[in-house]
């Protein structure tokens, strides 16, 4: 499902073959530690098992409830309260599969404490009906706790206790935590977050699957793609495992070429939030003990008109990873216009996706040939549930190997607690 292209990376396939050989033994050893669950952070490898060993009854119930919400034409709005992996991966999946506009339901995400944004959304929803999805393992995440107070209170005011709970689903710990306690007290429908799956790996669990189902995605196809990726990436031989090939090249650029930034490039608006997911995935997994590549995401060609100058001629502290989709979800043909007074008559009859792909290939040529930038290309055929699930789990295996190559625990994020403890101290004064 995934094809890697190394044509514009160093000197091409000859270079990558040498790198793969140099990493083969180390990769095999680390792969065994992952598969045998003996690696650093092994207690949080549940995302590897989930696509094939999930609770069948829970997912059946999740699909039934999400389809019921999706089929209710009277309620057009869905509000998702989540932050980090409880938001980014969810949105990445929905945006990956659906067209940007004219969706069956409008979805709004509350993932910050911006008073202006929250006020504006509350004012809108005072006049309209909506469903509420709150996602928090503990229920003590401040951003989500505050948002849940505000939006559940709004439902309560509009529809009473019974109406509020009918319009709400909580995704949380199966037994403990503040949100679990509230959900049980209020008799709110819940789905559980597995104990052994961290936030940035969790969009393939009820964390993401419920919202995806509400928006009309086929949950089973997402899980099918995930399971296929996990199976494909069990292979210990780096020559046969694209995830480990990519992990090795990333580590090589960091450790041997002193490239400390990775720029993720996409040419489709719908893929932007997948690169936001990658930003979190790699930053939280690798960024510890003074180590790690800093992930940067760019939407081209838009960002070629902002950071393009730096990428072409600036300080080369980075390499690029470009993700592309062969077949667009939809396409547009360029029409004749005002007797071609704009000078663009040579584009008449051409498809917009073709023009976009010419821009992509031209950028790759300019960056690699002229700018001497090393570029890894990741190519997929289609945007759909299965390809999203596959790529999501494929990158999860990449980051597991990448973190272990750096000799860090890829599955914790202790640094995130620093701002939280200071914030709570100040707020309680």
UniProtKB/Swiss-Prot annotation:
Picking any one GO molecular function of the record gives: monosaccharide binding
Q: Which Pfam families match?
A: PGI (PF00342)
- Active site (catalytic residues): 284, 305, 420
- State the EC number(s): 5.3.1.9
InterPro entries named among the record's database cross-references: G6P_Isomerase (IPR001672), Phosphoglucose_isomerase_CS (IPR018189), SIS_dom_sf (IPR046348), SIS_PGI_1 (IPR035476), SIS_PGI_2 (IPR035482)
Q: Which family does it belong to?
A: Belongs to the GPI family.
So what does this one do? Catalyzes the reversible isomerization of glucose-6-phosphate to fructose-6-phosphate.
Name-wise, this protein is Glucose-6-phosphate isomerase
> Gene encoding this polypeptide?
pgi
